[in-house]
Regions:
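Acidic, His- and aromatic-enriched active-site or binding-groove loops in soluble protein domains
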Residues: 1-12
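Short coil/turn linker and secondary-structure boundary residues
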Residues: 4-5, 26, 191
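C-terminal accessory/tail domains of diverse enzymes
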Residues: 12, 29-36, 40, 44-217
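Short, conserved phosphate-binding/catalytic loop or strand-edge motifs used
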Residues: 13-19
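Short hydrophobic/aromatic beta-strand micro-patches
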Residues: 22-24
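Short, functionally important structural connectors and interaction interfaces within domains
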Residues: 4-5, 17, 136-139
Length: 217
């Protein structure tokens, strides 16, 4: 499933290292703002926290080769629903359309391309058991988007780095999500989806020279 969905999926699994930061939310409306803000700011996150210019010990033309790899990965990227009015139900409906990577029943059981929705409906050809909450938690953990929801919101676009940089990322997003959320959300709601997506695709190579809404990051 992974290599079929993205040509660098296995590189992502075995050859990259990033920082993942978890944030709590207080309500569905609070979740929506944090989730969407995190997604809209992905180009800036990549540019600020780029730290992977090498591949196999050789320089590349990227500030963040890791993010270039992740952009060619199955089940990754920016979720299209991040540009829409968000609810828990909409997130759930979107997530269950992803193909299942595996289910665990004392061993790993692989599907034949079925989605988690198929699993819920009893159409998992290699398994007759009903889907349960643990299966859904496993499925959530196999979604590799730039921002994802589990029991918390996870921001995932930062390259791994040393301790000083490692502390900066959580502090940056804590300030935005918990102290300037409404103001930041108001700003990003003026941005066009296509401009955010273009900046997202360009940011691993252009870094802070990436343009978004007519301005360099």
């Amino acid at each position: 499933e992974m290599p079929k969905g993205g040509k660098q999926s296995l590189d992502m699994m075995y050859r990259t290292c990033g920082i993942q930061i978890n944030y709590d939310y207080t309500s569905e409306s609070n979740f929506e703002k944090i989730f969407r803000l995190g997604n809209y700011l992905t180009p800036l996150t990549i540019a600020l926290y780029s730290n992977s210019p090498f591949e196999s010990g050789k320089p590349t033309r990227y500030y963040s080769y890791r993010n270039k790899v992740w952009q060619n990965t199955a089940r990754g990227g920016i979720m299209p629903i991040a540009f829409e009015k968000m609810t828990f139900e909409k997130y759930f409906d979107h997530i269950i359309e992803y193909p299942i990577l595996f289910a665990i029943r004392n061993k790993y059981v692989e599907p034949n391309g079925q989605s988690f929705k198929d699993f819920i409906l009893g159409n998992f050809s290699n398994l007759k058991d009903e889907a349960n909450l643990k299966d859904f938690e496993t499925h959530l953990a196999t979604i590799f988007t730039e921002v994802r929801l589990k029991q918390y919101i996870e921001v995932r676009s930062l390259d791994a780095c040393d301790w000083q940089c490692l502390c900066d990322g959580p502090a940056f997003f804590t300030g935005l999500f918990y102290n300037a959320l409404d103001e930041a959300f108001e700003i990003i709601m003026k941005w066009k989806k296509e401009n955010v997506m273009n900046a997202y695709l360009e940011s691993p190579q252009k870094g802070l020279n990436t343009e978004l809404e007519g301005k360099k990051l």
